[in-house]
Amino acid sequence: MGKSNLNLPIQQSTLKVVFSRRMLVAFIMGFSGGLPLLLTWGVLQAWMTEKGVDLTWIGMISLVQIPYTWKFLWAPFLDRFVPPFLGRRRGWLLIAQIALMGAIVGLGYSDPVKNTGLMIGAALLVAFFSATQDIVIDAYRREDLPDEELGLGSSMYVYGYRLGMLLASGGGLILADHLSFPTVYFLMSLCMLPGILTTLLTPEPEVVAGAPRTMKAAVVEPFLDYFSRNGAIWILVFILLYKIGDTMASGITIPFYLETGFSKTEIGTVVKFFGTAATLIGAFAGGVLLLKLGINRGLWIFGILQALSTAGFAILARIGYNISLLSGVIAFENLSSGMGTAAFVAFMASITNKKFTATQYALLTGIMGLSRQLASSVTGLMAKNMGWQSFFVFCTLIAIPGMLLLLKIAPWNSRAADEARAI
C-alpha cells in the first residue's frame, strides 16, 4: 500500500473534494449501510419492550447481528466471483440491497411474542444481507478513494451511516407511536431505494489487481498478507476494545429511556432527531480534522471524548427524567461518537491492502462487530443486576484498555506512525 497522506493542511480545495462525486457516493452508501442496523437492534428492542419481553432477552437479541462479525467468511466469495452485470462491486451490491429490502419487510410481518422463531429468522436475514452490503460498500469505498481522501471519505460514509441509523430508529420510533410496527418496517424498506439508484448510476471503481484467479488466492492470500505485518494481532485487539464502552452503553439505551419515563415520541424527537445535528457535525468535523491532525491523533482525541460522553448517561440515570439534560447528553454523545467513528473507520481502511480489500476490511469490521455483539448481548443482564447508573459508570471505565493500546497502535506522533503503518 502506498503511504497515506492524511496530515495535509486544510486547503481551499477541501470544499471541492467534499462536494465531489466520490464523497456523495460515500455518503449515500453510508446511509444504505446504516439504515438496517437498528432495525434489528433499537427498533426491535422497542417492539419487544412494548410486547412485555423480559429485559434479559431484549439485550440478547443483539446476537442476531452475528453475521456482521462473521462476514469475513464469505467476503472472499465476493472478491473471487463477478456477477454477469454491473461489475464485481456494483453487481454484488445490487443483489444484496434488493434481498435486504425483502428481508426488512419480512421482519416487520413477524411478531416478538407470537412468532418468535420467524422474528429471529427474519432478523438474521436482515443482518446477513446488510453485512453482505457492508462488505461490498467498504471494498468499493477503499478502491474508489485515493489515500489522501480516506479520512474525509470515511467521515462522509459515517455521516451517511449515522443519518441512516437515526432515520431508522428515530423516525421508526415516532412512526411506531402512530402506526403498526409492520407498517414501520415496510416504510423503512423503501428507504433503501436511494442506495439502489446510486449502485445503478455510479461507475465501477478501477482496480489494477482485478479479481483473484482462484478461491485459494481469494481466501488464503488476504490473511497471509495481513498477518505478515508487524503488530497484526495487537491491531485486532485494539479494534475489539476501542469502542467497547460506547457500544455497551448505546446497546441498551432504548429500554433505559423508556424506563426513565420518556415516551417513544420524546425518544424519537430528542434522542434521534435532536442528535442528528450533533452527529452530522461530528462526522464532518472529524473528517476535516483528520486532514489536519492525522488518523492517530484523531483516535486519541476523539476516543477520550467518546468515553466522557458515556459518563453523561450515568448522570442522566442518577437525575432521572429531564428533557434538557437528555438533550445535552445526547448532543455530546452523538458529536463525539461521530468524530470517533470517522477516525476509527479511516484507520481500518488505511491498513488494508487494495489487492484484498473486501476480505481484509471484512475481517477488521468483523472484529469490531464481535465486540458489539458480545458486549451488547450481556448489557440487559448487567443493567438489570447493577442498576442503570452503575452500569453506565462501568461502560465509561471499560474504555480505558482500548485507549491504552493507542500507545502501541497509534502513538501521538501521528506523521511517523501513519507512515510506519503503510505497507
Give residue spans per PLM region.
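Juxtamembrane intracellular "pre-TM" segments in multi-pass secondary transporters
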Residues: 3-19, 204-235
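Helix-loop boundary and gating motifs at the non-cytosolic
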Residues: 8-68, 233-238, 242-256, 260, ...
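Glycine-rich segments within core transmembrane alpha-helices of 12-TM secondary carriers
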Residues: 68-71, 151-170, 176, 365-376
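Helix-to-loop junctions at the C-terminal end of transmembrane segments
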Residues: 70-87, 281-298, 383-384
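C-terminal ends and interior cores of transmembrane alpha-helices
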Residues: 93-113, 304-321
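Symmetry-related core transmembrane helices of the 12-TM Major Facilitator Superfamily/SLC fold
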Residues: 95-101, 183-200, 390-408
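C-terminal transmembrane helical hairpin of 12-TM major facilitator-type secondary transporters
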Residues: 297-344
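A late C-terminal transmembrane helix in Major Facilitator Superfamily
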Residues: 355-384
